[in-house]
Amino acid sequence: WHMNNEAGPSMALKVPEYPTTFSMQALHYSKEIEGGVIVVGPNGKRFCNEKYKTRHGKVPAHGTWKALTTPCPMHLIFDQSHMSAGPIYDGHPSHGWTQIVVQYDWSEDNNAELEKGWITKGDTIPDLAIKIGLDPSALDSTIARWNADAASGEDTEFGRTLMLMPLSSKGPY
């Protein structure tokens, strides 16, 4: 037994209707799903390698392990290609309270969750930013940088190597 450690946070969807979170397919370190996807904090900027496999929510930092940076609220930003690729929820039943106990049946096309307000849709990046309370120019700048990195095949900010796909230049998002 040991009590000198705690599990760190993870990036997941929390909705008012359920006490626990929903894991997102795009954030799973081993999944490759069509479409452009990034996670931003309340300043509209990326803050980590979204696909990094954490160890109980911890990441290596200068010879030690620290909790993954998780500014709140966080927003999973994705394009229509990702929305259409199948359920964004990782419903694999082998882990997590929501998967095992709640057994929520996420829709195959994500539209039921869009209708519930769990997913916010914007026709343009600035439109989406306004709807989710972000600075439109900050989010637009972040996506422009991500798209340039994805097109070059190198994430110059955080070294992400999986799902290096730009977000579409056409909405919706």
Show the residue positions of the predicted features:
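Residues forming the flavin
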Residues: 1-144, 148-173
